[in-house]
Design a protein with these regions (language model features):
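Membrane-interfacial amphipathic/re-entrant helices at transmembrane-helix boundaries
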Residues: 6, 32-99, 134-143, 249, ...
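Transmembrane alpha-helical segments in multi-pass inner-membrane proteins
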Residues: 112, 340-347, 351, 355-426
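Loop-to-transmembrane alpha-helix initiation sites
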Residues: 141, 170, 197-202, 217-227, ...
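Transmembrane helix-bundle core of multi-pass membrane transporters
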Residues: 182-306, 417-418, 446-452
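Inter-helical junctions in multi-pass inner-membrane proteins, predominant
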Residues: 78-86, 186, 190-192, 274-292, ...
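Membrane-helix/interface signature in polytopic inner-membrane proteins
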Residues: 236-253, 301-340
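Single transmembrane alpha-helix segments in multi-pass membrane proteins
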Residues: 69-74, 84-134, 159-171, 324, ...
């Protein structure tokens, strides 16, 4: 039988139909490309369609990190920005912003904001440092950490209740909280000129000190990395095969393999960088800072909470359309209160890491709570979390925090004298405005649909 010249060849009909279906699903529904696509080619096509529709994901912040690294490497004296010692320092500095950005993400997803996160973080750090002091309370380090998280979580819950139950705008509540807790911070410290210092000779205090300053030996780091990569690969593989057995759509296996390889490459790069001697020939300093696995635990916990639990789905639903979520039976006030509580508890951990980063010392000069909250919001939004709610992930806070830390340290390396301090504000501010502009334009281009 002769085929009509205008007829689609039988061999390509299925592929053409699949591509058209893919385009329609990506354009009409907010479904991750990994779920829609049945092959690596379709995944790349779907991802590109999402970028064109305004949902660029982590692409802008990843490109920004690369550009910042290249620019500072060129501009810094002796091209020192990408030296292993400086990269490890950036890791340590950025982890504070990462944790605070993840904390802020919890409320930004609800289209709310917490301006007190910086002051609450510092209070959490001071509480933990005070409780392990000897003489003093001399609590076990783990109990001191738990107490700081619980106290700060209660602070967040109280602010969340004012917002959720009394309908006071979160901006007003948290701004009042920022001023209130900034004053309480001075009281907890013991005065404007007081300070709290950890002793490295006492095990109970040394553990908190080592959260940022402590190092994991390269050998142990390689073993841990291998275990993590295998565990991650196994979880991805089992989840994919389980979905296929149930007749559900699942990411193509080639994409799973690429993800596993990417995690392994990034992890290996970090271990290699941290294994380079950052000290001297007489006193070598090598190893992965403890804070890196700590932040990975925070990232993993928040990712599971937001992506794999009813609480996370409710958060996205409320951020996208609170009235629709309420009509669907979601307890909107309860979710808001929990989000603020978890935000403040996570911020407390960031405050503890900040004190450890400054070699176990806390004073009124350790950090400016106003700068901390601005950097935390900037890191979250720059990373890809929407100020309008309903869109963002914990990983966005990680990437945004890394970018903020890179800019802050890069400016200090330029040795610009009196210009250094202004640039530490100007550059993140410019990047933040660009991120918000991209967010606004993407929403206009997509008809205002919230996408996760």
């Amino acid at each position: 039988m002769t085929q009509d010249p205008g007829e689609t060849p039988a061999g390509t009909a299925g592929a053409a139909t699949a591509d058209l279906t893919l385009d329609a699903e990506v354009a009409a529904a907010d479904v991750p490309p990994a779920i829609i696509a049945q092959s690596l080619g379709q995944y790349l096509r779907a991802s590109w369609l999402r970028v064109r529709s305004g949902n660029s994901g982590v692409l802008p912040v990843v490109l920004a990190i690369v550009i910042v690294a290249v620019v500072f490497e060129i501009l810094t004296p002796e091209h020192a920005f990408l030296r292993p010692s400086n990269l490890v320092f950036i890791f340590g500095l950025s982890t504070v912003y990462m944790v605070l950005a993840i904390a802020e993400t919890a409320v930004l997803l609800l289209a709310e904001v917490d301006l007190s996160v910086g002051a609450v973080a510092l209070i959490g750090g001071v509480i933990a440092f005070k409780l392990v002091q000897q003489p003093g309370a001399n609590w076990p380090w783990w109990l001191a950490l738990l107490a700081a998280l619980v106290i700060c979580g209660a602070i967040g819950a109280a602010q969340g209740a004012l917002t959720a139950i009394l309908r006071i705008p979160s901006f007003v509540v948290s701004l009042g909280g920022f001023l209130l807790f900034s004053g309480i911070l001075i009281v907890v410290l013991g005065g404007a000129d007081a300070s709290v210092n950890l002793s490295t000779s006492m095990t109970n205090q040394r553990i908190i000190y080592d959260m940022v300053q402590g190092l994991i030996s390269p050998v142990v780091a390689w073993i841990v990395l291998a275990v993590l990569v295998v565990a991650y690969g196994a979880s991805q593989w089992l989840r994919t095969t389980s979905r296929r057995r149930q007749g559900l759509t699942a990411p193509p296996l080639s994409l799973i393999a690429i993800r596993i390889a990417l995690v392994a490459i990034i992890g290996a790069a970090v271990v290699i960088i941290c294994s380079v001697n950052r000290g001297s020939a007489l006193k070598a300093v090598t190893g992965v800072p403890w804070v890196i696995p700590i932040v990975l635990v925070v990232l993993g916990g928040w990712t599971v909470l937001l992506q794999r639990t009813h609480f996370g789905r409710y958060v996205y639903a409320i951020g996208g359309n609170p009235e629709a979520a309420r009509r669907a039976g979601v307890s909107v006030p309860a979710i808001r209160i929990w989000a603020f509580a978890l935000c403040s508890a996570t911020a407390a951990l960031g405050g503890i890491l900040l004190g450890s980063f400054f070699f176990g010392e806390y004073s009124t000069n350790t950090a400016d709570p106003g700068q901390l909250v601005l950097y935390s919001i900037a890191a979250a939004v720059i990373g890809g979390v929407s100020l309008f709610g309903g869109r963002g992930k914990a990983i966005h806070g990680i990437l945004g925090g890394l970018l903020i830390g890179s800019i802050a340290y890069g400016v200090s390396l330029l040795s610009l004298g009196s210009l250094s301090t202004p640039l530490e504000y100007i550059l993140p501010g410019a990047v933040l405005l660009a991120a918000v502009l991209i967010d606004v334009l993407s929403r206009r281009g997509s008809g205002g649909v919230n996408r996760v």
